[in-house]
Amino acid sequence: DFCLSRGLGDVYKRQITDLDNGKVRAAEKVNGQWIAHQHIKKAIMLSFRIYPMENLNGPYSSWYDKAHLLKGKTAGWSKEDHEKAGFRMVPNSPVRKGSFVGKNAVLMPCYVNIGAYIDEGTMIDTFARAGSCCQIGKNCHISAGSGVGGVLEPAQALPTIIEDNVFLGAMSEVVEGVIVGEGSVLSMGIYIGQSTKIVDRKSGKISYGKIPPYSVVVPGTLPDKNNSSAASLYCAVIIKQVDEKTRSKTSVNDLLRE
């Protein structure tokens, strides 16, 4: 109450509104490198501390959450508001205040958390999730049941980033600030976090935390070099890399077939 009475609530509310309108972002690519905007992430985290809990009653249930976020991004919108925003939003898609959705995006029944940035022409498919502060580029397809993880804390940590023209297969998860490079195709049922080994099948090189642009990635296993009888461990395998022209002309299924 003290913070709200001193006007800090209005400051944070403006920050959330700027996130909502795409004027600011939790992370951004600068000179070819992704950086986290710590002050934006801190504003989100502090807003949870200064706003009280509130109740919202509906026709079949009630909800209890922070007052400034209890109602979603599009609460009270008219048809004209939706037309101006320019994205399609299917019923039963919780999209939180403080998330940005670009024009011509399609939100099937999905979940979009605070701070998420979804660029133009991207589809978040049925029961897929866009976590807090994640950045999803233009013309991506986040397939049914898949998730793009959120990262709020620590403030300096990069959120999970999906660059332009990426296909993320059904029931997959990319989390913990992993970066998926532009034009990549990730097959169904792949899971990638910061500790996941990413193996280039052609070179044998192992890396972590980043999928290079225009990679085609499938789940795989990696044997223990020192013990042939030990259980193999999960990894993500880059089976090929293609150029932009090939990616644009080749179907996802053809790219994944070897």
Predicted regions and their residues:
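Single conserved hydrophobic/aromatic residue that forms the stacking wall/gate
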Residues: D1-L8, Y12
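Exposed loop/turn and edge beta-strand positions of beta-sandwich/beta-sheet ligand-binding modules
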Residues: F2, Q156, S232
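Generic structural "secondary-structure junction" signal
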Residues: L4, A26, K42, L46, ...
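Extended, small-residue-rich solenoid/repeat segments and analogous flexible loops
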Residues: V24-Y111
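Structural signal for interior beta-strand "rungs" in well-ordered beta-sheet cores
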Residues: E83, F87-K225, I238
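C-terminal functional extensions of proteins
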Residues: S215-E258
